[in-house]
C-alpha cells in the first residue's frame, strides 16, 4: 500500500508531467487563460489519462506482448487514446454543452496531448503492473490538473494586474510557469 501511495505522490508532485517532464504544454498554455475552462479540461484529461493508462496496459499485456507485436505499441496506444477521447467528447457534449463550447478545439486535441501518450509509454517502460498503471495514470492526471488549475488562477490574477507592456500575455505566462516549475523542484527528494 505504501508503494502505491509513494507512486501517486511521486507522479503528482515530484515528477510532474508538465513542470518536470515538460509533457502536455499545449493545453497547459492554451486552456489556462480562464479558470472555468481549466477545470473542465482538468476533469476531461483526468478521465482520459486514467482510462487510457488502464486500457493501454491491457492492450499491451493481452494483445501486443502475447502476439509479439510490440513494434505496434505506439500506434495501438494512439488508437486507444483516440477512442477514449472520442468517448469523453461525446459524454461532455451530452452533459455540458457550455463546457464543450468552452473547451473548443482543446478537447479533441487531448488525443495529441503528448502527456497522455507519454504516460502510456512510461507505464510500459517502467514495467508497471495493472494497479500501478492505473495509479500512475491517475497521479499524472492529478498532477496535470493541479498545475493547470493553479496556473490558470495565476493567469486570471495577472490579467487583472498592472503588468508592464513587454511582459503582457505569453511572456508573463512563461515566467509564471518557470516560477511554478522552480517551486515544484522543492519536492525533489521527497520520494526516492
From Swiss-Prot:
Where does it live in the cell? Cell inner membrane
Tell me what gene encodes this.
Answer: rnfA
Q: Can you say what this protein is called?
A: Ion-translocating oxidoreductase complex subunit A
User: What is the topology of this protein in the membrane according to its UniProt annotation?
Assistant: Multi-pass membrane protein
List the GO terms this entry assigns under cellular component, sorted alphabetically. plasma membrane
Question: Assembly and interactions?
Answer: The complex is composed of six subunits: RnfA, RnfB, RnfC, RnfD, RnfE and RnfG.
**InterPro entries from the xrefs?**
Ion_transpt_RnfA/RsxA, NqrDE/RnfAE, NqrDE/RnfAE_oxidrdctase
Which biological process, per GO, is one annotated for this protein? Answer: electron transport chain
Top-level taxon? Bacteria
**Keywords assigned by UniProt?**
Cell inner membrane, Cell membrane, Electron transport, Membrane, Translocase, Transmembrane, Transmembrane helix, Transport
Give the transmembrane ranges: 5-25, 39-59, 65-85, 102-122, 134-154, 171-191
Amino acid at each position: 500500500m505504501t508503494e502505491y501511495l509513494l507512486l501517486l505522490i511521486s507522479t503528482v508532485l515530484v515528477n510532474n508531467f508538465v513542470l518536470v517532464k515538460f509533457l502536455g504544454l499545449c493545453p497547459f498554455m492554451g486552456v489556462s487563460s480562464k479558470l472555468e475552462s481549466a477545470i473542465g479540461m482538468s476533469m476531461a484529461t483526468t478521465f482520459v489519462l486514467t482510462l487510457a493508462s488502464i486500457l493501454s496496459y491491457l492492450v499491451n499485456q493481452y494483445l501486443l506482448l502475447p502476439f509479439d507485436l510490440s513494434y505496434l505499441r505506439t500506434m495501438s496506444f494512439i488508437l486507444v487514446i483516440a477512442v477514449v477521447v472520442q468517448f469523453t467528447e461525446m459524454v461532455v457534449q451530452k452533459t455540458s454543452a457550455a463546457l464543450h463550447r468552452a473547451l473548443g478545439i482543446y478537447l479533441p486535441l487531448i488525443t495529441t496531448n503528448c502527456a497522455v501518450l507519454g504516460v502510456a509509454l512510461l507505464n510500459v517502460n517502467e514495467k508497471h503492473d495493472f494497479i500501478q498503471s492505473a495509479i500512475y495514470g491517475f497521479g499524472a492526471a492529478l498532477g496535470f490538473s493541479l498545475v493547470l488549475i493553479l496556473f490558470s488562477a495565476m493567469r486570471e490574477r495577472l490579467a487583472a494586474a498592472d503588468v508592464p507592456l513587454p511582459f503582457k500575455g505569453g511572456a508573463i505566462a512563461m515566467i509564471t510557469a518557470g516560477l511554478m516549475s522552480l517551486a515544484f523542484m522543492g519536492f525533489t527528494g521527497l520520494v526516492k
